Amino acid sequence: MKNILSVLLASLVLSSCSENKIAEKQTTFCNPMNLDYGWGCFQTKQKKARSAADPVVVLFKGKYYLFTTMDIGGYRVSDDLITWKNVYFNSEVHASALDLDHYVAPAVAADDNYVYFVNFTRDRTKKTVDVIRSSDPENGKWEKCGEVRRMADPCLFIDNGRLYFYYGLGGTQSTTFFEVDPVTFKEIEGSKKVLREYVTDVNQCKSGYQFGRRELYDEIDASAWQGKFAKVPCPEGAWVVKNNDKYYLQYATPGTICNWYCDVVLESDSVNGGFVEQPYNPVSLKVGGFIGGAGHSCVFKDKYENWWQVTSMWVGNHDEFERRIGLFPVSFDEKGRMRTHTVLGDYPMQLPQKKFDPQDISAFGWMLQSQNKKSMASSSLPGFESEKATDENVRTWWSAASGNAGEYFVMDLGKKVRVNSVQINFAEQDINPDAPKETDYHAYKLYISNNGEDWKQIVDKSKNTVAVPHEYVELSVPVEASFIKIENVHTPKEGKFALLDLRVFGFGYSEKPGLVKKLSVQRNQEDERYALLTWDKVSGADGYLVRFGYQPDFLNQCIQVKDCETTDLLLHILTKGVKYHYRVDTYNDSGITEGVVISE
């Protein structure tokens, strides 16, 4: 009897130390989106890296469909914008939909009967491209329905049964418009017109957000480049939506390979002209934090009439064009001003399956607990030390010396904190690009501890068989922990076990940081596109949120400064002739403290 009781007691202890605390129904998400991401072919030593960009989402018959550049060679379908399933085109339309097993920046739109797809083919010898459509995209059944002129970065917009195309890419192409017959797809004679002229000289740019193509990369401060920007922007990725009888035409600038990649919006009462660039631009900007970039976007409505933006975010580790997909809420206020909510846009956001206020679901309170925390690992490659998995930077990473099961990474959170969710951003280190597709999955276990010695398993993904490069785990109930540990079970494509960052979200049981004092702004009088902000250091802050906008009630721009020691920032993205208003907020592991707005 004594032996039986001992066995029962031991089994109870083991079960209490090996709970799987993953939420059964995920209600939050965290950028970048946790997709499997296709293996884009790049001219690098590794030859391949995960990537996707230039996204389009359409809602069709109650389901969402996601199309992205240089990804899986197909598309994805979802019921809730969280869980996605891969779908592939039927073989009959491969020649129409794909170039070398992928497609680039397609035009996708839906009406009540069909989803339409037009590829941006890279074959410059082609004068026309096919239009394909599907009444059953969930099962990958498509057919050809017409042809249109070859376009760079096309956008198809359907309005009251009429079909319009917008296109243009690069410093030598304007944003151009034309209409097609909705049945034959023949171009309507005389409908073609230029909506926005291209830029030939960077000095003619009225707004500084046009600066920095292949000059700025992941810097958040433009001091080293003031007066030196020379490259013309690469405007691209037109997108059009209609709200309250107004048309909103977006395009991306200055170029996709940087954190400053953003969207600009123009408004008009007409679908085919009269578009005016808005003083609150850029309409979509995400600079600072773990990952940046918010350009070449698609704005769409969900099932509950909420607006969203799906967008391109920049990584650039194995190739300049290595990118990810982000999702942000969008709003239109009573004045018709469009706003993309990107503040702390790589922190957890709620995704309620109902009508919501974007201010309530973004940056809603689960704060980062892992920034610059002490760490250790089972092994580390030279140059890829463990601290690079806690630095809040998608462009650095830790790598173990092998991909063997049992390699691990441990983070000391410095104190006991509440943990609500964890984002595990896996890196690709020394992969074998020719490894079988069946090897492309992540498997791991996650543990917590209060002393760094006695571990309790909270997540068991040892039997996982799919790729989860930006795994986001929402816990069913919050846990308290002082340490967190991830242990490798399997790494994709024979690579080494590696992490871009292990990010822990919850509450740090600290006081919120203090208020920023003595904020001052010096607008450059010789070049109003620049302004220098300075403020006093705030102890207890993990960083600062530099907010600004053209009206004190519309501070829609934000640059995240991830270091409490940094107390100045040179902005370069302002517009000549526009007066700005500024505020600097502080944040830490327990919340955000709003600053005081000052005006020029």
Where are the regions a protein language model picked out?
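Extracellular low-complexity, O-glycosylation-prone stalks/linkers
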Residues: Y447-I448, G540-V561
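Short S/T/G- and acidic-enriched coil/turn segments that sit immediately N-terminal to beta-strands
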Residues: V264, H442, E471-Y472, E565-L570
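Aromatic, loop-rich ligand-recognition surfaces of beta-strand-rich domains
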Residues: D391-V459, P469-L515
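Pro/Thr/Ser/Gly-rich low-complexity, intrinsically disordered linker/stalk tracts
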Residues: F505-G540, K576, S590-E600
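Beta-strand-rich modules
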Residues: L571-I592
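Short beta-strand segments within Ig-like beta-sandwich modules, predominantly Fibronectin type-III
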Residues: S462-V466, I559-T566
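Beta-rich carbohydrate-recognition and catalytic domains
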Residues: N20-A230, K242-G289, Y304, S312-D357, ...
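Short, flexible loop/turn segments at beta-strand junctions in immunoglobulin-like
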Residues: E474-P478, K537, L570-T575
